[in-house]
């Protein structure tokens, strides 16, 4: 593992870890940063699968007590069964649409200009959702009904468009559908587990020939870095939302998206042939 490969792994691991669970689109940031540091092709596809697993492991670790309680409670406790059912219901739409359209979306939409547009549009929607008065029906994830879960599951599918943000779509969707900010955020974290693991397993099997033994040190470094920074992001976000809205993330999305569009419009960076 040479110095440049290690540096690329660290940079992309940091980006994945910090952005995966913030409502600012990890995929969008990965596409932009990978293009800037010239990390692309088949190796990048395999690497992205690994660092996503690092990020999701951070959430599993952070919520290990809740996961343990749910697993133990499945045979005898109705709240544990309801919570599990809600996760499966919310997960299902992404499975169906992902299998049907993932390749087409990756081929035509995985580029910096699409990311920039989605960042701006998503930021505007986020500002509108935060300023809109909405009645809180659900204070805790255990109080959710199946129809809350299903609606959030459909909204999550919007995140197939790079730049939209999986966490952003599910959190804002949760707010619009009556969840408290804490409940929407926590359910987004829990929903990430089956969604991201499922996507990683599917992609890992589909592109299994891309994994080469020689890449193991670089992939392991990216995995560890992603795990560490995802832990920082998850804990930081849970503390942040206790006293703040998501407006700061909305303004960041808008500013970052406009910056990308400006570099394209004025020819400062050639995004026309960029790919994730």
From Swiss-Prot:
Keyword field: Antibiotic resistance, Cell inner membrane, Cell membrane, Cell shape, Cell wall biogenesis/degradation, Hydrolase, Membrane, Peptidoglycan synthesis, Transmembrane, Transmembrane helix
Q: Which family does it belong to?
A: Belongs to the UppP family.
Q: Which purpose does this protein serve, as stated in its record? A: Catalyzes the dephosphorylation of undecaprenyl diphosphate (UPP). Confers resistance to bacitracin.
One Pfam family this sequence matches: BacA
Entry annotated with the keyword Membrane: yes
**What EC number is given for this enzyme?**
3.6.1.27
Superkingdom of source: Bacteria
Q: Which reaction does it catalyse?
A: di-trans,octa-cis-undecaprenyl diphosphate + H2O = di-trans,octa-cis-undecaprenyl phosphate + phosphate + H(+)
The membrane topology term of the UniProt record is: Multi-pass membrane protein
Entry's Gene Ontology BP terms: cell wall organization; peptidoglycan biosynthetic process; regulation of cell shape; response to antibiotic
The organism named in the record is Pseudomonas entomophila (strain L48)
Q: What is this protein called?
A: Undecaprenyl-diphosphatase
Asked if the Swiss-Prot or TrEMBL record annotates the protein with the keyword Cell inner membrane, the reply is: yes
Q: Which regions form coiled coils?
A: none
Q: What else is known?
A: Bacitracin is thought to be involved in the inhibition of peptidoglycan synthesis by sequestering undecaprenyl diphosphate, thereby reducing the pool of lipid carrier available.
Give an example GO cellular component term for this record: plasma membrane
């Amino acid at each position: 593992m040479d110095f440049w490969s290690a540096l690329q792994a660290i940079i992309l691991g940091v980006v994945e870890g910090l952005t995966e669970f913030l409502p600012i689109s990890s995929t969008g940031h990965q596409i932009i940063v990978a293009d800037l540091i010239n990390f692309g092709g088949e190796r990048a596809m395999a690497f992205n699968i690994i660092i996503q697993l690092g990020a999701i492991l951070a959430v599993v670790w952070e919520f290990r007590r809740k996961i343990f309680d749910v697993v133990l409670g499945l045979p005898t406790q109705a709240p544990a069964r309801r919570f599990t059912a809600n996760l499966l219901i919310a997960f299902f739409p992404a499975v169906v649409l992902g299998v049907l359209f993932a390749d087409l979306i990756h081929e035509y939409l995985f580029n910096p200009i699409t990311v920039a547009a989605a960042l701006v549009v998503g930021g505007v929607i986020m500002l509108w959702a935060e300023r809109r008065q909405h009645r809180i029906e659900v204070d805790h994830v255990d109080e959710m009904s199946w129809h809350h879960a299903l609606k959030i599951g459909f909204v999550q599918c919007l995140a197939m468009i790079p730049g939209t943000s999986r966490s952003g779509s599910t959190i804002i969707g949760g707010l619009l559908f009556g969840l408290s900010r804490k409940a929407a955020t926590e359910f987004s974290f829990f929903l990430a587990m089956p969604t991201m693991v499922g996507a990683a397993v599917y992609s890992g099997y589909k592109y299994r020939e891309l994994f080469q033994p020689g890449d193991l040190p670089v992939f392991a470094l990216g995995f560890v870095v992603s795990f560490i920074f995802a832990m920082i992001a998850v804990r930081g976000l849970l503390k942040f939302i206790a006293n703040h809205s998501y407006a700061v993330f909305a303004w960041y999305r808008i500013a970052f998206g406009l910056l990308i569009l400006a570099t394209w419009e004025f020819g400062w960076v050639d995004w026309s042939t960029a790919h994730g």
